[in-house]
Amino acid sequence: DGGKLVVVDIGANDGTLLKYYPKNFFRIGIEPIKKFAKECSKYADVVVNDFFNYKSFNESLGNKKEDIVTAISCFYDLEKPNEFVSDVKKIMNENGIFIIQQNYVVKMLTQNAFDNIVHEHLEYYSLISLQNLLARHGLEVFDIELRELNGGSFRTYICYKGIRPVSNSVYE
């Protein structure tokens, strides 16, 4: 990576998010669907054509520590969220940021957005349930953005516990 900031997009799809990072970032896409992985390679320096887990990541890229890890619209599809979070922590450097964007169950319920509940999403999270999951792994939400997308969603910014100041948005 030559001293560049390193970003990993898990569930990178066609690389849309990665294309917006500056060229001075080392961009890694994790995408299990072969057709999308091929598209993603236009914007990623490296594409791992597999589901994310520490073992496959380490085999492909070695024991790298990443600056930014994103999981956009895929966190609610996980069969083993504890294992996933544990594996993300293993690839993050101590000052790294993990960003999750997903449907927000509280907004969905208050807006009666039941049409956004779909069979492939295995779980939906509130901030408290996500914080409890992250705390088991020594991670915490340090900032949050509520969004209107998909009947209500939230983007959470996560770090190693105690590394960054926690924004007032987390307490509101």
Where are the language model's segments positioned?
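Conserved SAM-binding motif I beta-strand of class I
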Residues: 26-31
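A short glycine-rich, Lys/Arg-flanked "PGG" loop and its adjoining helix->strand segment in the class I
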Residues: 82-97
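Conserved SAM-binding strand-loop segment of SAM-dependent methyltransferases
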Residues: 43-57
